A protein has these predicted regions:
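Amphipathic alpha-helical coiled-coil segments that mediate homodimerization
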Residues: 3-23, 58
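Sensory beta-strand/linker motifs that couple input domains to effectors
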Residues: 105-115
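Short hydrophobic/aromatic beta-strand element in the GNAT-like acyltransferase core
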Residues: 20, 96, 110
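Regulatory loop-to-helix N-cap segments in sensory/regulatory domains
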Residues: 114-132, 139-142
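A short, aliphatic-rich beta-strand micro-motif
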Residues: 93-102
Length: 142
């Protein structure tokens, strides 16, 4: 059980050597993501990430596609999914993974991490971050 989402996210960022992170939860109708907590996102962007439609931006793409979305260098290439304002984070390497319900049918939210340096997240790193979503699933299903 997660008692402090902010502290939990900080530990995930430490484990992955990342400087920014977000946790979003799906709205009851399953069409948007609402921000639960964040670390390292500039204040000017908070209103833009507080409610994200499925399919928009990195987190929205991960929710809609139901799979990890990874960008090596957000500063140079938006990868067809990131919004131009995402560059204001100063993040280069980024990864967002969906949080699935116990039965795997529903996207409960998205966990996102980012680092300042360009980085290609490996399949192993993507799988490791997906595994980290288990406590969030338990929290969101309560």
């Amino acid at each position: 059980m997660i008692t402090d989402c902010q502290a939990w996210l900080q530990e995930v960022l430490r484990e992955f050597s990342c400087q920014t992170g977000t946790i979003h939860r799906s709205t009851p109708d399953g069409t948007h993501l609402t921000l639960v907590t964040q670390i390292g996102v500039p204040e000017v962007l908070l209103d833009k990430i507080s409610l994200i439609p499925f399919g928009k931006g990195i987190a929205g793409a991960a929710a809609e596609r139901r799979e990890p979305v990874e960008l090596c260098n957000l500063q140079q290439d938006l990868g067809g999914v990131a919004r131009p304002d995402a560059r204001k984070t100063n993040v280069s390497g980024s990864l967002a993974v969906p949080i699935f319900s116990s039965d795997g049918k529903t996207v409960l939210g998205v966990l996102g991490i980012g680092m300042m340096a360009p980085h290609d997240f490996t399949c192993e790193e993507q799988a490791a971050l997906m595994a980290k979503t288990l406590p969030l699933r338990e929290e969101f299903e309560r």
